[in-house]
Amino acid sequence: VALLGSSADETALKLKGKDATTVILMMGLQGSGKTTASHKLAYRLKKEGRNVLLVACDLVRPAAIEQLCILGEKVGVPVFTIPGEKNPSVVASKAIEKAKRELYDTVIIDTSGRMHLDDALMEEIQNLAKVTNPDEKLFVADAMTGQSAVDIAKEFDEKVGITGVILTKFDSDTRGGAALSL
């Protein structure tokens, strides 16, 4: 299907070689599945031989850091955190420093979301993108969101630029909602 990409080059993640650090920024609304998608992506990349570091930058949702740590431990991928830090850009930049120093070739940054688009969320994501200069900016959307997912994706694309989309919870709705729209 041309909509989904007509070649593997169009749909594959743009990963640098193992001698450099690829940074992947995960973004989307609260509850879209960013944390779970982050750990699943980390697991896949680890199985492909990448040395992955997950970064807990959702400093808004209670227990988000703990959730990512539990999921990371389940798949054998370390999670970078700075207990008590309130600025996700500080956490992300320190994580990338660690990744380069300790030869991680892939960094996946799990970010916070909000129930609805707002200026605070977009500013936080823009700051993270500016500080981390990510190679991939993946928009995570709940497949059941429907047409509003397109409007939300457009906003993220205009403010930050989207390089890819991950649809989550695809198994919970037979209609697929946002799948073809995105």
Regions found by a protein language model. Give the residues of each.
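Conserved phosphate-coordination/catalytic loops
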Residues: 86-90, 119, 147
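Alpha-helix termini
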Residues: 41-46, 89, 123-126, 159
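Conserved phosphate-handling catalytic cores of large alpha/beta enzymes
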Residues: 104, 116, 122-130, 134-182
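Conserved D-loop-proximal element of ABC-family nucleotide-binding domains
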Residues: 62-65, 117-119
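Short alpha-helix boundary/capping motifs
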Residues: 35, 61-62, 89, 146, ...
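Primarily NTPase-proximal linker/entry elements flanking Walker-type ATP/GTP-binding cores
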Residues: 1-57, 64-84, 91-101, 105-111
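G-domain G4 guanine-recognition motif of GTPases
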Residues: 30, 55-60, 82-84, 111-113, ...
